[in-house]
Amino acid sequence: MEAKQSYSRRFFLKTSSVASAFAFIPRKAKALYDDLKQFIIPPKEVMPLTVTINKKEYKINADSRTTLLDLLREDLHLTGTKKGCDHGQCGACTVHVDGKRVLSCLTLAAMLPGKNVTTIEGLSDGDKLHPMQEAFITCDGFQCGYCTPGQIMSAVACVNEGHIHSVAEIKEFMSGNLCRCGAYNGIVESIQKVAK
């Protein structure tokens, strides 16, 4: 004969109060979120922007907090510039603004009117690759290719700014661009080839 399982009044009260609390929490949390949403998520401040990217002028409306990286990838669909760390530590998002390299994840789009932005898509001349792009192919300056656009943009700046007198100087200039695959020797060789 099977023993009948009995539940005490105390067990019933504990179980039902925990269950009712879980039923109440989501509604209360949503109500609290709705009350605080205006303080947590500030409204977008859309502003008109006229920016020149790869020698082409764009007129767009963008949130004043939009980074250059997000403007390029999300709004203009120029996806050659990569989002790596989104904290300015890996160099995958490197582009040129008025000929100087910048990390597009740390640059606000609102700072760009009147400036010229060049991305990896703007380096080539039609179907003719930039000499640095050709050198990266010839010297195996990439492996998986994810960091390559940022590496090439920094490498072009390295040559243009004259940081090519020694391997140590090239490595120092390029130290802000990380390559998880370890193609650093090919990258340095590519820069030296273009610098000749």
Named regions from a protein language model:
Residues 1-20:
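N-terminal secretory signal peptides and thylakoid transit peptides that target proteins
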Residues 10, 64-97:
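A basic, amphipathic helix-loop patch mediating RNA/tRNA/ribosome contacts
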Residues 14-32:
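Bacterial Sec-dependent N-terminal signal peptides
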Residues 26-61:
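C-terminal segment of N-terminal export signals and the immediately downstream linker at the start
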Residues 60-62, 104-105:
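Short capping micro-motif at the N-terminus of alpha-helices
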Residues 65-78, 106-196:
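Ferredoxin-type iron-sulfur electron-transfer modules in oxidoreductases and energy-metabolism complexes
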Residues 87-111, 117:
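Mid-chain, structured segments of secreted extracytoplasmic proteins
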